[in-house]
Amino acid sequence: MPTNVSGTKDVPIMKCPVCKTPELQMMDVEDGLTFYNCPQCCGNWVKGAEYWKWLEQHGPNLPERSAADSKLLLAEPGFHIDCPECRFRMVKYLVGHGLSFTLDHCEGCKGVWFDRNEWEALKERNLHDDLHSMLTSFWQNAAHKEARKKRLEQIYIARFGPDDFAEIARVRAWLEARANKQHLIAFLTDKDPFDL
């Protein structure tokens, strides 16, 4: 059962950065890793130093699992929130790797806020031990590129329809594998390739 954070003398009272009112409740989620949980929105705060300590004791980095249709309901609020520990405005970081949510990271105290089920979604994919990588520009560039690709794909599906988009994507992949790709494209785009 979670213990009240305000019940300890050396730990300041932390309020939920999303709901603003409930005190965060201390709870162990992994062996050696403590979260501070909001009983109202089910979000979780993990202190940066505690995560790093857990990561060092965790063992080797687990291999990423392939994307699967998760049944977890996520509850990302969509607005910027302030750190429950030091009150800095937190920065949103895209997770990527097939997951479309963001994590809120405090640049001041290095803690991370997980909205409902975000930690669980990371664990399903074995990405929960990669937070340090997610906060790098390399990871973020790849995550933003993935998000742009997904948005453009949705635009093309809306424009062409799902069946036509699937077919043109198949043809495009086929063309990319051909050495004479430019000649094939010229043939396709010529109004009448048989008119000399």
Regions found by a protein language model. Name each.
Residues 44-46, 51, 112-114, 119:
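Short, structured motif recognition centered on aromatic/hydrophobic residues
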Residues 32-43, 100-112:
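Cysteine-rich micro-motifs
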Residues 137-178:
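Charged/polar low-complexity intrinsically disordered segments, enriched in acidic residues
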Residues 5-15, 27-32, 70-80, 95-100:
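Short, flexible, mixed-charge glycine/proline-rich loop motifs
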